[in-house]
Amino acid sequence: MSKVYDWFEERLEIQAIADDVTTKYVPPHVNIFYCLGGVTLVCFIIQFATGFAMTFYYRPTVTEAFNSIQYIMTEVNFGWLIRSIHRWSASMMVLMMILHVFRVYLTGGFKKPRELTWITGVVLAVITVTFGVTGYSLPWDQVGYWAVKIVSGVPEAIPVVGSSIVELLRGGTSVGQSTLTRFYSLHTFVLPWLIAVFMLLHFLMIRKQGISGPL
């Protein structure tokens, strides 16, 4: 076993990487509130795992979406638990994200030279809320349908381009199958890639600049 490790160590310098990851300086003023970003990440990982599990059974059509959710809840082994964890961790992720933003703002973590870290964090917050909006519609029940109708109709108040934005979101002039398809694609493909990219940028900046000092 040691020979295998030595072979990889010689080529990849695994120990040096491990030392760099585990020996970063942590300022003495850091407390439990500085863990809120990490808790948000844990919630996202739970979201990813449980959401991926549900894609095996969910059907993104207006005629089958609600019934497929009922099937997950009543027929799939531990389906009720997986979906419940997905919903609970979604609420927890939004809450932890909000608290994290407030903590960073109140402790001045957005100031020079960490402006870009703050900007990527704000983008991540917007993506998180968008996850919630798109996911809320997927059961395609009365609550989900009317939520989509209201949210997708908001841009109509924008002069000139408002109607075009609404049609782009809905896939037409009214809420229907095209709308559900768009929201499902956003929720399961577009947003996960976006949040992964901005998370990577966010974490790399934090690793490079370290944790901000006290006010």
UniProtKB/Swiss-Prot annotation:
Pfam families the UniProt entry points to: Cytochrome_B
Q: What does the entry list as the binding residues for heme c?
A: 35
Specify the protein name.
Cytochrome b6
- State where it is primarily located: membrane
- Entry keyword annotation includes Glycosyltransferase: no
What's the superkingdom here?
Bacteria
Subunit structure, as described in the record:
The 4 large subunits of the cytochrome b6-f complex are cytochrome b6, subunit IV (17 kDa polypeptide, PetD), cytochrome f and the Rieske protein, while the 4 small subunits are PetG, PetL, PetM and PetN. The complex functions as a dimer.
